[in-house]
Amino acid sequence: TTIILLIAFAAIQLSKADDLKFVFVMARGGDFVAGDYAGGPKIINKEAKDSELTEQGKQEAFQLGTKLSELYKTKLGVSKWDSKTTYWPVALSQKRTQVSTLITGAGLEGDQSKRNKAWTNEELKATSFPAMESFSRFIKPNECPKYLEELMKQKQEISTILKECSSSVQQVKSKYSAVNVNLPQHIWLAYETLKKLKRQQPSSSTWMTDDLMKNLRECSAKITWLATTKTDTLRKLSGGLLLNDLFNDMDQITQGKAQPNAPGGKDSKLNVFTVSQFLVISQLAAFMPEGSKLNNKAVTASDIYPEDGSHVDIEMYQENNKWSVKLVYVSGKDKQPQTITLPGCQEKCPYEQFKSALQKYKITDEEHQKACKN
């Protein structure tokens, strides 16, 4: 009996050896019915903002929850996933994104019956939190002209990127005349729309060859990474608010308090935030200053581009009263997890060092509103 007890005790100690205390997950929402993105070219003549999740999108969201449970349930010491106590699903205010985060929660709980559930307005509304709407401010020219102004200073480099895929873009334009070959956002958003069409309407998408899509993806990756990382101002305006909100929450957790607004208070161990692709990119930009590594290699735009099923996990550890942070990135549903390391940090970065490395990108909502206009 003593030996059995010792073995059980050793197993408990091993499972708690890394002392994982909390995980923030930012995930790209699941696949949805193809539509035209705001700011992009008219390809389908139906707005993407009204599109609902496809069956594949629901499956992706559920599988993410299942995967997160396998990864973190034991490590976090959670006996049962429950959105009122042990985890908090949040999302941007688009209905499909809210549905996506709730289905990810169903995946955590292992509840298949919720995959096709008709969610009530109350359930959808419960996925929002106060700071959320400000995160998208930077991409709205009327609310943040400074971001566009800063981006336009990079015109020369943007032109170089556009030349790299000009023949592919011309091919797309021959099919969809609304594509403006000189607008970088048209290239990226056209690629994202075409990718959905290729998957959802394969018979009418045979002209979209693998080489064409690969070339458009490469350009989209370079455009979006440049647009969020080329200068400190771009990093700050695109991802600084997210960073500020996360640091506020992380500060509370390192002081032994609950994540603010989490329904479960101190019992809450996991926060799932489902967002649009551009916010995953801007979060990565704010979390990866110059010199950061992805699996100990230099970062390329192509490696970082978030596909369907992508998510960033911020793991918070406490060892001997000292807190550290580990960043894990999965760039798509079939991709392996990669560790992000900041300059001067090991895989796990002491919390104060982590904060100090990113401090210059952090910005409050009030400061952000001013910086957007000045």
Swiss-Prot record:
Main location: secreted
UniProt-listed SUPFAM superfamilies: Phosphoglycerate mutase-like
Protein location: Secreted
Molecular functions per Gene Ontology: phosphatase activity
Signal peptide start-end: 1-17
Top-rank lineage group of the source organism: Eukaryota
Keyword annotations: Disulfide bond, Secreted, Signal
Gene3D superfamilies linked to this entry: Phosphoglycerate mutase-like (3.40.50.1240)
Keyword Secreted included in the entry's annotation: yes
Annotated residues for binding of serotonin: 25, 245, 249, 271, 283
UniProt xrefs under Pfam families: His_Phos_2
GO cellular component terms attached to this protein's record: extracellular region
Disulfide-linked positions: 144-372, 165-219, 345-349
UniProt family annotation: Belongs to the histidine acid phosphatase family.
Comment text on domains: Lipids and biogenic amines bind independently through different binding pockets.
Protein function: Probably modulates blood feeding of fleas on vertebrate species by binding and sequestering different mediators involved in the host response. Binds biogenic amines: serotonin, adrenaline and noradrenaline. Binds leukotriene C4. Does not bind histamine, leukotriene B4, leukotriene D4, leukotriene E4, ADP, and stable analogs of thromboxane A2: U-46619 and cTXA2.
Protein name: Acid phosphatase-like protein XcAP-1
